[in-house]
Amino acid sequence: MDIPTLQAAKALVLDWWKALEHTDESKAAAATVRAFAPDITTYGPDPINELRGPTAYLEQFWQPLRHSFAGLQRQTHLFVSGYSNGRADGNRALDGRLWVSGTGVFKGLFQNDYLGLPAHGRPVEIRFGEFCEVRDGRIVSLYYLIDLIDLFEQAGIEVLPPSRGKPGLYPPPAASDGLLTGAPDVVLTQQSEDHLRRFIFDGLNAYDKSELKSMGMADWFEADVKWYGPGGIGACLSFKEFENLHQRPWLVAFPDRQVQDLTALFAENHYSGAPGWAGVIATHSGPYLGEPASQRRVSINGLDWWKRDGEKYVENWVFVDMIHLFRQFGVDLMARMRERVAARNA
């Protein structure tokens, strides 16, 4: 592990994040151009999706976000970095890339409409997750999500049935120890990486399509695990809630789902993270959140962070691009949002 390069990458991302909030948008833009490789590809939430180059990112994502949410500030809950080992075969020679990640909330006043969602002038918290791939002192790729379903709910627009889990819950780690800006403990980091690889590629792929127990999730999660799911699913505050409120409905809908090679998988001390664009492939063969089975093959884009205590996870922060997922069912949640806004205003 090249710790000096890792620490320099952390500083690069932290400096860029800070510059993004500058009140002078030209300075925020200049900082982004400096931080990004000229040919960067950024992978964002549907309907923003894939963009090429720093200018496209600024003009199609960041500047519209700042325009809509006055005084936008980033409150980071987790800051975790490392060298990736995200292939199922464990061939680090074909991966080994350096990543810097973070998650938390953007806070601001919703003063101008955003993506067709009407502004209401009140404070909002927008969940964010980002994974930055760093090479030669520049960010060369960026995978990021904001939780649009949760934002819609804060504006009083429901595009999915009420969450089975607790809505609106996305806190920092209970121990307030998630901002890992210092040098990592190499031994502890390797233990966490090995643990996550076993969990992802052995545990999650073990379902026999009949019983939840076949996955052995109780071997991986503490009984009182805190699982902070995205808008539409909600938070589960125990393993029993996780099984009943998320895992069972998910496996009914996607019984054949399989984790693929991930975009990245890495650890730092007790924490670990993994982005997966098409990280899970499945057939939508059962009902899910009000939608009947479409029998379509779907790819799932998501971001995850975990905290390990010994041999079990005690906290898990989860993003799923629900708009992208439902679009593959043949359901346009953005259009549904606009229809419900129009109906409310009629």
Label every PLM stretch briefly.
Residues 1-346:
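C-terminal and inter-domain tail/linker signature
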